[in-house]
Each structure stands twice: as C-alpha cells, then as structure tokens.
Design a protein with these regions (language model features):
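Short, conserved catalytic-motif segment at the N-terminal edge
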Residues: 219-277
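Preference for extracellular/luminal or secreted protein segments
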Residues: 1-218, 222
C-alpha cells in the first residue's frame, strides 16, 4: 500500500515557520470558546438553588486557590449581583479558615470558586466538609474533574456543583452568567466522578429560568439531606414495597419537600400527583 499511496517518494517537509498564526485564526479561537462553553456542566442543582437571585448583599463568593486566579469570574459576579468577596489560599491555617467561616455565616447564598491545584490537603478537605452554614453551598470548579475527587466528602453536602473544566477568562465570565441563568449550560459527564456523579450527570440551566421557590436552607434545613429522600423512595419502589408514595415535609407552615413517586397501585398506572393523599 505504501507504493499505491506514493509513500515511497520523499514527502515535502512541513513548514513550521508561522504555523501558530495559521492555526490560531479568529475562526479557530471562536470555535474553541464555543466548545468550552458547551462543556460547562452543572453536576447537581438541589431544589433549584440555581439560578441565583441577584439580591444585594445576599451572596458571598469565597475564592480558594491562587489569588486573582478567578478574577474574571468574581468581576462578572459583581456585575450580576452585589456580592461580597473572600479569598483563601490552599492549605490555609485553621485560624484563617475559622475567621472566614464566621464572616460567611451572615449570607443567604455562598458560592465557592475553586481554581487549579496540583494538591488538595487534608486540611482543605476537612474544612470544606465541616463548613456548616445556613446558606446553601454552590461550588464552581475552574479546573479539571480530577480536583473534585479528593473533595467528594464536601461536595456530598453541596446544593450545586458547576464544572467548567478550565479557567480561561471568557469561560469564567460565562459561568458567572450561568449562575444567574443569563447563559445556558447543558453539559453532561462522559465519565463518572466517584460515586456521587455517575456518567451522564448534568442539569439544564436555560436563560430566563427562575430560582426555586423553596430552598431548605432558608428554613434551617439542609438540601442534601432532604434530597436523599428521593433515593429512599425509589429504592422502595424497586423493591416492590409499595406501588407509589407521596412525601411531604413541612417547616414553619410551608412545604419544604413535596414529591410523588410511582403510581396509585400495581394495576392502576395513574401517577402519584400533588393532590393525592
């Protein structure tokens, strides 16, 4: 075949000079930016905590990593809402962690921005896992998926996780707009990240979406705890313990959790509705 393809003849050498200019055209850069935006993945969004409501003074952004590494994201967040910004380096001492945690206690929503790190210390994991605030926690990762793996104990207690895969300026600005449903996100994971995020995981964010009406943290409860009810209810369905059920959790006279599962009976295919008792 090498004779048929002409490979026996000496091929002209590739011209290396000026190659970067021939490759990095405006069209190529626009395509790369489009692909980056398409890959943004919302891994979970319990009780529709996203999109955030742009209420002045309600939102804190905690940046963890090298200082200014997520400056485009922080600036874009400031344009969307009156946020208050905090910063911590990786492996910060305990006194600094505790000081920041005390300051975060005053906010209704907390966004934790993670920028690249080759090493996540046990101290970082312990702090984030033990971060006990009244606000739901929204994580944004401007890193590869690998950074999520050591932080799984903390992410299991989050309300939303957004994976951007990288940290280009335009991408950071885009993710900030996704958090307020000004831009869409429809990415899906092609592979599993631990047991928490199986392959295919991804939540849709569409422009114009409204924030969830009831977020458990606003009533002194935890979204990740109530969300686990879903798995318990579905496990009972799979085991044949019941054909269907409705789970209602009230707090301060309001339904914080209200979901139906399955059907009325084994012979009745009517799905359980909000009006069923």
């Amino acid at each position: 075949y090498k004779y048929m393809l002409g490979l026996r003849n000496r091929q002209p050498q590739l011209r290396v000079s000026g190659m970067s200019y021939r490759i990095n055209t405006e069209e190529a850069q626009a395509l790369a930016a489009k692909l980056r935006r398409s890959a943004v993945t919302v891994l979970n969004n319990y009780f529709d905590v996203l999109p955030l409501a742009p209420v002045e003074g309600d939102i804190a952004v905690l940046s963890i990593g090298e200082k200014e590494a997520d400056a485009p994201f922080v600036e874009a967040m400031k344009k969307n809402a009156g946020i208050v910004h905090f910063h911590l380096p990786w492996n910060a001492d305990e006194a600094l962690w505790q000081e920041v945690q005390g300051q975060l206690a005053a906010f209704r929503r907390v966004v934790i921005s993670i920028t690249g790190s080759a090493y996540v210390s046990d101290r970082d994991v312990a702090f984030l896992e033990g971060l006990n605030l009244r606000a739901p926690l929204v994580y944004t990762f401007f890193t590869s998926y690998r950074t999520l793996q050591p932080l799984m104990p903390a992410l299991a207690k989050s309300s939303a996780v957004v994976l951007a895969h990288s940290a280009e300026t335009d991408l950071q600005q885009y993710v900030a707009d996704v958090l307020f449903a000004k831009k869409p996100a429809s990415g899906r994971m092609s592979m599993s990240i631990g047991k928490l995020f199986p392959a295919g995981t991804g939540c849709m964010i569409e422009p114009g979406m409204k924030p969830g009406k009831t977020v458990p943290e606003d009533y002194g409860m935890k979204s990740y705890v109530l969300q686990s009810i879903d798995a318990v209810a579905r496990k009972g369905l799979e085991a044949g313990a019941y054909p269907g059920c409705r789970v209602l959790v009230w707090k301060d006279g309001l339904p914080v959790y209200d979901k139906g599962f399955g059907t009325h009976s084994d012979k009745d295919t009517t799905t359980v509705r909000s009006s069923d008792l």
